[in-house]
């Protein structure tokens, strides 16, 4: 959603009006994001996601403020329902492998949960990895708690960075951590 949070903008770097683009709705992929060129190639309307680091650079299709919408679950009920797991906090980066549907994200720390209670054990840092489809299919609860922080960035290689916001609700999901 390019119109929400600190990293928002009115027009993308192709001159397209910024908008809220719903990518997944009720578990179904309903849209992607595009800049003007990729939209032309796909035969779709651009979504206002053509962004570049500076006027010296080419625009690329880039994420904006990307997050899950809030759900209905109470965080306390989600924690109580966990036999063994971790509440991960302060995610600070992630990357995807679009060819193989892989994903990797990092959180500053995780608080261990055993039989629905925090044990006091902290692990840090936490790297989550897996297959996007498996992760999305494993989501069993989405909290009503919702927070978006405008301190992120989206990179394309070592020189192409644009500001984004991240965050959202808590998700109860199965992921591989290490």
Residue ranges and their predicted role:
Residues 1-178:
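N-terminal small-residue-enriched
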């Amino acid at each position: 959603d390019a119109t929400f949070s600190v990293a928002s903008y009115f027009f993308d770097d192709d001159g397209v009006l910024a908008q809220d683009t719903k990518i997944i709705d009720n578990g179904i992929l309903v849209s992607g994001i595009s800049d003007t060129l990729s939209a032309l190639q796909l035969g779709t309307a651009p979504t206002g996601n053509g962004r570049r680091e500076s006027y010296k650079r080419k625009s690329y299709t880039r994420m904006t403020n990307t997050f899950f919408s809030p759900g209905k679950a109470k965080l306390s009920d989600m924690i109580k329902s966990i036999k063994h797991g971790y509440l991960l906090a302060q995610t600070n980066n992630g990357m995807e492998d679009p060819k193989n549907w892989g994903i990797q994200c990092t959180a500053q720390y995780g608080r261990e949960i055993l039989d629905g209670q925090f044990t006091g054990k902290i692990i840090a840092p936490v790297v989550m990895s897996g297959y996007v489809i498996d992760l999305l299919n494993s989501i069993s609860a989405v909290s009503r708690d919702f927070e978006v922080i405008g301190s992120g960035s989206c990179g394309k290689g070592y020189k192409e960075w644009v500001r984004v916001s991240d965050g959202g609700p808590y998700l109860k999901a199965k992921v591989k951590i290490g």
